[in-house]
Amino acid sequence: MQISTRHLILLVSSLLWALSTNGQFYQGSYQEFGKNRVQYKDFLWQQFRFQEFDTYFYEGGQELAEFTSRVASKNIHSLEEVFDYPVRDKIQFIVYNSHSDFKMSNVGINGDDEGNIGGTTQIVGSKVFIYFEGDYIKFEQNLRKGIARVLINKRLYGGNWRDVIKSSTLLNLPDWYIEGLILYASQAVDDDAQNIIRNDVMTGAYEKLNRLEGRNAAFAGYALWSYIARTYGENIIPNILYMSGVSRNVESGFLFVLGKSLDTITKEFIAYYRGEYGSMSMDKTAISLDKLDIKTKGDRVLTTFKISPDGRHAIYVDNILGQYRLYLYDVLSGKRKKILKAEHKLLRIPDFSFPVIAWHPSSGAFTYAKEWRGKLMLCTYNLDDGKTTEREVFTLDEILSMKYSPSGQQLVLSAVDNGQTDIYLYYNIGNRQERLTDDVFGDFDPSFSKDGNRIVFTSNRPDDTLRTKPEPIVLGQNRDVFAYDLKSRSPYLERITDTPDLIEKDPYQYEGRQYTFLADYKGTTNRYVAVYDSAISRIDTTIHYRFFTVAEPLTNYNSDLLDYTVHPNTGEFSLLTYADNDYQFYHGNTSNDGAATRVATEEGEGGLSEEPITNRPIRRESLEEAELTFLPDKEEEHSDQEININNYKFEGEPDYTYERETITLMEVPSDNEEYRPSEQGYTVLDTLPLPGARNYNVNFTTDKILAQLDNTFMGEFYQPLSGPDGLNPGLGGLVKLGVSDLFEDYKIVGGFGLAGSFDNNTFMVMAEDLTRRTDRRIQLFRQQSRFSPNGFNLAENVTYQAAYRLSYPLNEVFSIRGSGMYRFDELILLATDQFNAPTPNEISNYAGVKGELVFDNTLPMGLNLRRGMRWKVWGEYYMDPTN
């Protein structure tokens, strides 16, 4: 039985109301709350050491670490050129196998220092935390983002702790400045982000940059820096960065270098992009499908929208600050039902990969994949009785996408295991999976054909041959459409598209050899239909055929399609798009696609034989020439039987009519030749020899310094009853120094506080071990205070306390804590005259235990401003062990 947070709060409040307790003098102005990280497994770290950097990884992540090591050097040097600033310190790349593992880490766990007026200075380091999301393209983008962040911080705040303290005190940069510059340098912006930028520019959302938050601020900054690079040259960016650091002012950086104020630059870049986007949208058409009246809130991110095979129901998922909700929507009644709510709203990197959803072909159920307590779960929801069945999926790290077979007995998965994204066939009976591909290339978005005998998917593989763990010579930065024959299990795939500079996604197979997918060919992501066909290549002793694809655009919309689902057996499909500051939901039937193709052919709109868009407004690198229609020739031999070459017909061939010329882009080498594509459009891995893996040894570095004026005690502490003089220690200085290990699993904090009169002083040292789920802390504390017990005499109280605490997190916002402590108090009556000099000191000893329930889901909105709720319930027991 699960107790909701609301019910637990009501229970605790009732108990507090019913209890009759005697108040005691307690220092309550400082109460420790804080979020938690929940470790469901142990991390045993190893490392590769190089001259410029070190790469750290754990079990199951060696392939990721090797990839990181091979591409890190070229990315470091590339970003050094962008910022015109060298990396002087060795960078530590810390690789996590998945986003879920990264959320278990202790990276970024801090106390409540944000409430201190003096603030905390975070020491700039050279650590780069990266995690694998199933796609090596995104993985390398995250790597570049981390390197860019290190370079920007070093450039602005300096390389040693003295420069850091000075710069962080005087320089406060907005999110759009830092995060936008990181996105620009790393080029970690996909088509969905481009669509949001286009929408925000056209609706005027970027006119007040400093009011933007989160990803909107980052996208706005990316657009501004891209405009500056295109208008004034990329080499001007390091100068702006340098002047901002020297002058300690954002405005001055632009004014000194460009001679224009930030307001002027903002108006110019908005006008520039409005012109670009306006010209792009002139030949676009509006979506004419049935639109569902689904209301969404502006602060939520929609990640999934899928119509049922019968078109009666739909599922969509929204996400806000990492918390996602899954809704079932009735198309006829317009009502919705919340099926699932998971995770908590926290200021962290959101994970948009879950839940992964697939409709059962009967339309009476759907299956979704989620993560629960470190486990990968498949859950099936039945629409008839509203019940959900769950089962754990073993051996896989993450599921990226999945679709049901026409029979409903199997699922095809794109899943991650040990740094590889491959295609799996999952059997509902037996809860087992069969691996269909096994190589370093990424395989995504699989779906079954109408008869269930073929699997269509996208991949960045350079050729059409399946190999078991081939040497990673190159990794494609594009995705092409491939088909796999389930009956023959042939290692030779059918290549449907060959576009070195484009990414196709969400492919499905129609009737026969017709396919549909999404692609960004004319500046926006639209639907396409492709026909796979063959023709005679040449005749010698045998007849040789070449296979090619003719593709047509089905849509020419002004906004990108974010999610696309097709049910080949019923023809129902759904689209999710973002336009006019709102997510929009559409559905239709593929029976109308033929008409759409004829219209596109007759009017010449979006035909793929036209010149592709090569100047998408804010891409740093323009697209090279690419033809979605083209496919490498592939020859196939047939028998020597006599054939009339002037009048022939393939068996079982549909009667297609083609109105466009088919051109051969490139020849595929013969089977005994090695396939070596050009470096254009591919990531060529460095061939540097990798050293042997070493075990990680714990070492500490300074990570924060706190210095402030303060009038509170340093911790939760019972004060000796000494009259009004002991209410607070008086205004004085407080200094804390914190060190932590590389992974922030071990922390040591030392500090002292001195009152202005030097009558009161406090010293403390604390050590924490956060490596396991149960966090451990030991704290030593000394406090000395002086007061007048009767207005004439002076007394001094010296307290020593040692405490040991265990904290067990139930989730990221709720924890159970238990402490044991021993305290020694000595009351000294100072010898101010001959009468009180002989007075002996009073000695007190206390031993105690404390239990706490702590809840904290607050979000910082600014200094001493929080949104959310935090509460604590605790009980204590003390005794004198000497009596």
Regions found by a protein language model. Give the residues of each.
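Juxtacatalytic substrate-recognition/specificity segment
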Residues: 23-167, 174, 191-192, 253
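Beta/coil-rich, acidic/histidine-enriched accessory regions frequently appended to metallopeptidases
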Residues: 26-32, 36, 45-47, 246-348, ...
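Blade-terminus and WD-like Trp-Asp/Gly-His loop motifs, strongest in beta-propeller folds
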Residues: 305-313, 356-365, 402-410, 446-454, ...
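Outer-membrane beta-barrel channels and translocator barrels
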Residues: 362, 405, 449, 453, ...
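Outer-membrane beta-barrel initiation region
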Residues: 640-773, 843-867
